[in-house]
Design a protein with these regions (language model features):
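Glycine/threonine-rich flexible loop motifs
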Residues: 76-85
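Alpha-helix C-terminal capping segments
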Residues: 56-62, 89-100
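Short glycine-rich anion-binding loops that position phosphate/pyrophosphate groups of nucleotides
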Residues: 15, 48-49, 73-76, 146, ...
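A cross-family phosphate/adenosyl-ligand binding-site feature
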Residues: 2-59, 63-64
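Short, Asp-centered acidic motifs that coordinate Mg2+ and/or phosphate
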Residues: 67
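Glycine-rich phosphate/pyrophosphate-binding loops
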Residues: 95-117
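Short beta-strand segments
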Residues: 11-12, 70-73, 104-105, 141-144, ...
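Electrostatically charged, flexible surface regions
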Residues: 116-240
Length: 240
């Protein structure tokens, strides 16, 4: 990202997978500066990804902040996993501030090539910034392992702009017992997502393509809103 501009790193101090858009407000947030020898590398925040962006913009980074990039996450954040993702939540937090914000995730793999993924992501980010006048300010990029291998081999991976998949998957748990006979459960990705009638990010990633999805954080169902405003919802005036 330093090829684009000055970078300030503000990252969680501990693993935060699956925390969604949680924030810290009942306890104080602590953070510390991280150095590599004499070189300042960034801030480690004892909080969630959304905390990092909120605190970073408000207190830790130079003003103004022109771009938020969340990631690269080790593991895809596509389909309904967008709603569980701390990586995407950090980008959403940036969009709250009306700052162009981009989440980047790489398929989980023992030999995940973060360097190739970073090169792919930087090119896509530059192209997105070229269109800053567009309505969208929030984007979700996912990069499968096949795309990084193709990129290493000198082949340009296909880029697909698609909606997020909304099919439910990964609702199976493995049940086990601890030494005291108490049950506990491990979440799994089974059953895997099934093919859908319309193209989605999940399907394109399964075929080895890089995906970009424009998102927005306003969760209002606009069509239903208009319909509900015509409903008779007035309550009877009576005391309990």
């Amino acid at each position: 990202l330093e090829s684009i501009g000055r970078v300030t790193v503000v990252a969680p101090a501990t693993e935060q997978s699956g925390v969604g858009h949680s924030i810290t407000y009942l306890t104080p947030l602590t953070c510390k500066q991280i150095y590599d020898g004499e070189i300042f590398r960034g801030w480690a925040v004892d909080g969630s990804p959304a905390d990092c962006v909120k605190l970073g913009i408000s207190e830790l980074t130079p003003k103004p902040t022109d771009l938020i990039v969340s990631g690269i996450n080790g593991g895809l954040n596509a389909g309904i996993n967008v709603l569980y993702s701390g990586t995407v939540a950090a980008a959403i937090e940036g969009a709250f501030f009306r700052i162009p914000s981009i989440a980047v995730s790489l398929e989980e793999d023992p030999h995940a090539d973060f360097e190739a993924a970073a090169s792919i992501a930087v090119q896509l980010i530059q192209r997105i910034l070229h269109h800053q006048g567009s309505a969208a300010r929030l984007y979700n990029i996912n990069i499968p392992t096949k795309a990084t291998r193709d990129y290493r081999a000198g082949l340009a991976p296909e880029i697909h702009v698609l909606p997020m998949g909304v099919a439910r998957y990964g609702d199976h748990y493995i049940k086990r017992q601890d030494p005291k006979g108490r049950n506990y459960y491990w979440s799994t990705n089974d059953p895997p997502p099934q093919p859908t009638e319309h193209p989605t990010d999940v399907m394109a990633l399964a075929n080895g393509h890089v995906t970009i999805t424009p998102l927005h954080f306003d969760m209002t169902h606009q069509q239903q809103l208009s319909e509900m405003q015509s409903w008779s919802l007035a309550l009877d005036s009576q005391s309990l």
